[in-house]
Amino acid sequence: MAENNYEKYLIRRPMYEVGGKVKGRQAPTMTYMSNDLVPGCNLYIDLSWIYALPEPNPHVFEHSHNYDKIVLHIGADTENFEDLGGEIEYYVGGQPLAFDTTTALYIPKGIKHGPITWKKFTKPHIEMSIMLGAESTEGGWVSGDIGRQKEGLPGKKDDIDYEKYLVRHPAILEGTDVTEAMKSPAKIYMSSDLIPESNVYIDFGWIPGFPDPNPPIPDHVHDYEEVVLLIGGDPNNPEDLGAELEFCVGDQPLTFDTTVACYLPKGIKHGPLTWKKYDRPHLLMPIIIGAGTLAQAAPAGQKVE
């Protein structure tokens, strides 16, 4: 039997395929997960840096998708993680939601959302979209009237308070072997404890220096699919990770120094994750699909004996 080459699951360079002609933000956005990149993953993930007040503003208008979606706005201040560096007004179901903190927004399939308007800008920050179940780029992003401006603002047509889908402040995971080694607690921004309708676990945090001990994450497995993102913190060079790491997947060492996404099918052993070099802070984000609770996600997984 031929051995698996797990390199096929590691996205070292993104596709630049969506968006354009928008000042003040990275456009096109960086696609780090799709069926074009990893056939059969049925996920779509893109991200981009916001450098200034976008122009035009808004440039994303009311639209909907046939898939559940999670939108993250992530502050890049490693000393004040929850400070977004801007103020955004995001319409969901015709209801305006305003925030100036790092947030996660869960949008069930079929719910209209947009426009998205930046009201203030103080520091660069990241916008990330995760589409669950999307089989193609078109299904994951280009949907409805996303780029078409309409007269007036959307009106609310139901009695749902869409605030319930917005995570303004994270649950904090600390006191574990992993968080102690990272010198930084993990911030949980999506789980069924936070959003009961969600069946996805997401935590993330900026890595402030070499973990100690290193590697902080041993080899382990999950009963769920996972995507691990490591995102560089330089908005002027977003593909540069600011570190060199070795990630063992199925006992195959994969070394990288760029922003990456790694898709991990359920049951595939992965780890340890070892830092070889460290230059500046970068973001570590595990996304575990189908694991709604912290207990199900088991951030360190089931250790392999």
Where do the PLM segments sit?
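Short connector loops at helix/strand junctions that flank enzyme active sites
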Residues: N42, H65-K69, D83-G85, D100, ...
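A short, N-terminal "cap"/entry segment at the start of jelly-roll beta-barrel domains
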Residues: M1-V60, G147-N214
